[in-house]
């Protein structure tokens, strides 16, 4: 994922405790998990990654994938980019993988070919300008915008980044000709990857620094949190922020299914180690029996990795694994 490569360069330049990053158009979540891994490797537990997806149906997919990834420092929202304008200088890095005319997806998705037209290119270019202008106040002076599309059109790529630098105020980071041997092309303002010349689908990525002075130091409330609350941006309600340990029912704490997957899980439940066959059966929601394991809530694991919880009753157990994540294919 080349956008992740460019992001890691920005992280190397600006990375510090308390860093805030916005993944503006984040669904389905592959980019978010890549960013989260890079942030955790560089900063440990001291960062916040806000992953946003304006489309409600896609935001639910994003939220579920973030839950499976298990990093409690990732917050998921579903708002229009304009909603972030009220939070002046809130983010150190903004990654904007914006909606585009989709030429880089032609090989993968026949619908992208059917929907393409010159008019679509112009409409997308205008929409991308609107998105960048809307979110621009939320990027702090000296912060970095990583801008990407999955198209080859100059109007949506180099020209739009040049427009942002000129009209919004910034300096384009000169792209590097790093991987020509792997088919990565150099353009005026970024790098172009064409489907058929590189593994995967087409992509264009560029970056710019917002004009102004970058001032290190933590503003009030910038510390990344790992509990579930209303989030660090008042007025924007998160779909997901941290993972609750569970919910109380009948005087008993029922563990949240996602808690087992979270990096915040402290291992307070007895562990049951599964064979590969048992692990598949658990994910397939087949009946399982653990007569020799402790009664009550247990965390089931495969090769040391938590998969979820069961309520072990001895001769049978009730799974807490979400039905929406059940393996549907025949596992035999």
Describe the predicted segments one by one.
Residues 32-36:
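Conserved SAM-dependent methyltransferase scaffold
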Residues 48-53:
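Conserved SAM-binding motif I beta-strand of class I
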Residues 16-27:
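Conserved class I S-adenosyl-L-methionine
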Residues 91, 144-147, 151-237:
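Class I S-adenosyl-L-methionine
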Residues 57, 92-133, 146, 150-158, ...:
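Mobile active-site "lid"/loop adjacent to the S-adenosyl-L-methionine
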Residues 44, 139-141:
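Helix-to-beta-strand junctions that scaffold the AdoMet/dcAdoMet cofactor pocket
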